[in-house]
Structures are given as structure tokens and as C-alpha cells.
Amino acid sequence: MENAENSTRCPWCGADPLYQAYHDHEWGRPVRDPRRLFELLILESFQAGLSWITILRKRDGFRAAFQGFDPASIATWGEPEVARLLQDPGIVRHRGKIEGAIRGAQAFLRIEARDGFSPFLWSFTGGEPLINHPRALADVPAQTAQSKAMSGALKREGFNFVGPTITYAFMQAAGMVNDHLATCDWRS
């Protein structure tokens, strides 16, 4: 899309430039890199109960606090790191979510060694993006059979804050599902 200023977008991103840039350049674009998928999944887990724009505004803080979302590093963290993060105003300071990110990093390492994290996650869509054709926001589901299956599998592996609504939002963010509205100039 050349002229983003005059484009038609999905209405959920509103007029906020940060939200529009996220919509235009990230949301719905397939991500296969395991570390980037880990970052997206952890950020989505922190979003539980909050708005996504809150997480976007703190994303740089999260990246700094979580050492670029390096799973090998995060997996070794204990109470000192949790205490440090609970004092960091650049992130969402929620003990359960921080501890969940540490357990998620440990689970990531197990999955990556066994199956590969990216193939594991993409297996819930058959390895290819699911292309939906919503005409309005009301046509976009909050969860699907695939997000329920992914949620259950991630929980069994040790992830937290990954219910089926969070995993569906993750699938949208990672381009596993294309839910750009039919009228959105950024659909393709």
C-alpha cells in the first residue's frame, strides 16, 4: 500500500498512528521466526484483561526488560528477576504474567528442541494462513476450534494466560489467520 494516509483500514485500529502502523505493517502478516512468535505470544499473554494498544505502547519496554525476548535467558530467571520486573514501569507489572513468561520460555525451549516452535504453532492451521472473508467486525470470531486446540496444547506444554481468545488474537497477529475486513486496503 503506497498511500497509507488515504487508505481504508479495519476500524479497530482507529486514528492512533501507532495502532495504524501496527495494522498496516504487522497484523496479519505471516511470522515464521520462532523467537518473534515467542515474543508475540508472550505479549498477547500480557494483554489478557487489557487493551492491545496498552501493550503496543509498552512493547519497547517489554523488549528491554525481557532481553529481546531471548527464551534461553528468560528460562533461567528466578525471584530476583521477577522482583526487578515488578518494579519496571515500562511493562505490565503482574507477577502471574511475569512468572508465566518464564514458564513459557522453558516450554518454548522444550518445544523448539522437540518439534520446532514455529512448526508446532503453525500445525494448528495446517501450516498455512487461514484466509477469512469478514465483511464487518461482528463477523470476526473471538475464538475458533483452532485457537481452542492451540490453547489446550500450549497449556499442556506449560504456558499460562493463553486461553482460546488470547490464542486467536495471537494467530491473527502472527498471520496464521487473515481477518482483515474485505474492505480493508491492507487485506493482501
Q: Model regions: which residues?
A:
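HhH-family (HhH-GPD) DNA N-glycosylase catalytic core used in base-excision repair
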Residues: 1-188
